[in-house]
Amino acid sequence: MIQQSFCQGPFLVSGLHGDQILGARDNQQDTFSILVGEDAFLLVLADGMGGYTGGELASRAAVEGFSKAFEREYLSPGERMKAAVAAANEQVLAVRKRGGKDDEMGTTLVAAWIGREGVCWVSVGDSPLLLIRNEKMFLLNELHQYSEELDRMADEGVISRDEALNHPARHFLTSALMGKEILLMDLREECFPLVPGDRLLVASDGVEPYLNSLGPAGMRYLSMLSAE
């Protein structure tokens, strides 16, 4: 599914592009939303987990809960994001209670608010927020994977670098929205400044091997997707 929306404000001209690829799965467990305002826009993406339909239900509930709460609140972007994450988590809990066999469902979530001050974000889990600048890609948010702990242990000499890189639990999540206590959350309340030509990519973790295979030509292609 592809959705496109374009907005023009006093501070920028932007192109928004959303795409989903099913891949090897039988059903799509990612959900995304684009909310366009007069002088800012909000990108929200969730990558669900938990059974055949559980992940799909959890990601949809999280995105809907987050988006509705963000629109209701009249606070700073950072405060609105914090409140919206709590609302998203409550929505996942409500779906879990109705889910029966899918009661262990959960989802990651990453949201980016882009306005005249730059980009603010919040994320739970391992869905990346990426900045493409001058054909180079930078990870803006913190990924909540066990890989962070393994790399720290390797740096301290507790385990070898090879053991850290090849550990079977390397990509296990250390935080997610499951209707329970949120163990880790990356919240950027002070906006990160953007410069002309910057591109932002909000994605699920499945995009990593694809991006690694693109190389410089791929970076140029990604930049062109939202070029003016």
Predicted features and spans:
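PP2C/PPM-type serine/threonine phosphatase catalytic domain
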Residues: M1-E228
